[in-house]
């Protein structure tokens, strides 16, 4: 949200412009009222919450390997495929199920909306990726040295939290941050510490 507001302050985007102006893959064709940047910022785009499109699955479909191709948080092909999949899914959802209300009418938390916002930042922020923009324009200026969007780094950081989930009725710990990582970073890839969050 802060990064979007930085772009708005610089006159690069308009909060009341339709998302399709910045992300043409999102056609908005099944809605009478256009979803705007402001709607997504306030989780009022009218979308129902959806399961995550996982970064690992998208990277695998593209034949990418993190050891060879680098952290997927900085990979343009993953971001391009991710935004295409998210945009198609939201367009399909509104055609099949309608909306959870007209854009701006109701709050409905949807990670896909913030995923699209992060892609606006990737496209218009002047940096190679959303993660690069966040580091240069938000995290470094605030001195947030233990905050990032990387997927590989936390699995190698002994201070990173262990993720737990129930598998076959048993709680199991994992340090695989791809397991539930949304393909577009703005939809939930940020990792931080309480100390860093105080700086924000």
Regions found by a protein language model. Give the residues of each.
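Short, glycine/proline-biased beta-turn/loop segments that scaffold the active-site neighborhood
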Residues: 15-29, 142
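Generic hydrophobic/packing signal
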Residues: 3-8, 23, 41-48
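Glycine-rich, histidine-containing beta strand-loop boundary motifs that form or position
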Residues: 2, 17-19, 44, 134
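Short, surface-exposed loop or secondary-structure junction motifs
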Residues: 30-200
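Active-site SXXK
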Residues: 1-16, 114-122, 197
């Amino acid at each position: 949200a802060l990064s979007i507001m930085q772009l708005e302050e610089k006159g690069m985007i308009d909060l009341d412009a339709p998302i399709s102006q910045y992300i043409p893959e999102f056609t908005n064709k099944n809605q009478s009222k256009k979803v705007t940047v402001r709607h997504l910022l306030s989780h009022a785009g009218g979308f129902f919450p959806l399961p995550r499109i996982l970064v690992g699955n998208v990277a695998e479909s593209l034949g990418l390997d993190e050891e060879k191709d680098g952290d997927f948080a900085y990979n343009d092909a993953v971001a391009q495929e991710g935004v295409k999949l998210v945009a198609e899914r939201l367009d399909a959802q509104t055609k099949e199920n309608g909306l959870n209300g007209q854009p701006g009418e109701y709050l409905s938390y949807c990670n896909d909306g913030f995923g699209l916002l992060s892609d606006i930042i990737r496209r218009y922020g002047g940096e190679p990726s959303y993660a690069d923009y966040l580091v240069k324009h938000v995290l470094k200026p605030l001195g947030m040295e233990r905050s990032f969007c990387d997927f590989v780094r936390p699995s190698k950081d002994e201070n990173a939290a262990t993720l737990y989930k129930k598998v076959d009725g048993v709680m199991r710990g994992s340090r695989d941050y791809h397991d539930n990582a949304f393909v577009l970073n703005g939809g939930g890839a940020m990792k931080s510490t309480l100390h860093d969050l105080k700086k924000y």
